[in-house]
Amino acid sequence: MAKMTTIKMKRLLEDRLKNPEYRIVYKRDDDALRIEWRDSGQGMTVSLPNLITKYNNRGDIAIQEMEEHIIEALKIMNETHHLQGMEKHIFPVLRSPSFPIETKAGKKLIYKDHTAETRVFYALDLGKSYRLIDEELLKEEEWTLDRLDEIASFNVRSLSHEVKKDQVADNDFYFLATQDGYDASRILNEAFLEEMKANAQGELTVAVPHQDVLIIADIQNKMGYDILAQMTMKFFAEGRIPITSLSFVYEDRKLEPIFILAKNKPEK
């Protein structure tokens, strides 16, 4: 594989994204490429060093994926979206409290607090991608937050919740990873958590390290907490959209963060 440089990557993207309606600007100070619509100025900025790292690890597929992501993102920015008639395509998504509450265009996103470690935003599913719902869109449709939340909550309950089980040191770990974009969102399905709680032999704990996984653990001994902590940290570090490296105890229909040092102390 030939060594990839910033200039080579810049030219490669410019060639792949040729479109008379796009404006492509190289931002030398940031070592980034800005791709935007000529008429509206809406667009996205790509860090060239980050893309080169992905290319070095994965080859041409990394560039192909970035090209598809840019085209899809710009397409969404240029479309008019409605909530009415799209009720079945509205879902809640979990994010960390540090996630921006405004878009780069200055639109305020709709969200509600979930736990000290998580917030719930709302997504309009568009097939290959989704758009986070903002105040302006909600106002245009004359919807309330309560109505939006009710619809999103209903839809997340309709998603499958088949899990894969793994037993480690007499503790049961269940993984939900369908890759549909809403794996972590299933933590909001209270009926599902209640079912898991009813069948648990020990303490039921839950983790959402990143958007594409939900971990449920039936902890039956002290070593289980240590395993869960290490597991959650690993998933958090690898996640495309990380949420939290902490896990939660599920008790009395509430989620309480548990602070675990990844160190197993033997009982005296």
Swiss-Prot record:
Short name of any one Pfam family annotated for the protein: DUF1444
InterPro entries: DUF1444
Domain of life: Bacteria
Disulphide bond pairs: none
Protein family membership: Belongs to the UPF0354 family.
Record's protein name: UPF0354 protein OB2234
Source organism: Oceanobacillus iheyensis (strain DSM 14371 / CIP 107618 / JCM 11309 / KCTC 3954 / HTE831)
Upper lineage: Bacteria, Bacillati, Bacillota, Bacilli, Bacillales
